[in-house]
Amino acid sequence: MPNHTQNTLELTGNPQTVMAFVDQMGKHMDFEKVIPPPANMFRENLRRQDVERCAREGIPTWQDWQRKHWGTKWNAYQTEDVVVQKWSVNFTTATYRFQTAWDAPRPVIAAIIKQNPDIEVSGGYVLEGYEGCGSFYGMT
């Protein structure tokens, strides 16, 4: 059983840009929409060429792949519905709250920042038992 990490991700910017992100992501944070896993990675019985390819790329299991590319064991869970606040005609914030296993999803946050240069990304995380915390602001 992992230590759970509580994450809050805020995306702020032009309403059309922020809402385009929300429309693409949906009500809940889903790492597969940011960094999609290989389609064949999750088959119960991998073919020999799949096993060889995974071994060659150093990602033989779904758990190893997700930890490498998402920074956490599983996709987001215990997610809350996104909260959208329209502050003005030119300013909107979308807030996603979710948990992750063991750590914050740093590669996912970095990918969101890279994929959405016109949105300011902030927020942060707290590890279960307050064993650590950090900010997403300015992460690249």
Regions found by a protein language model. Give the residues of each.
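Long, contiguous binding/interaction regions
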Residues: 1-140
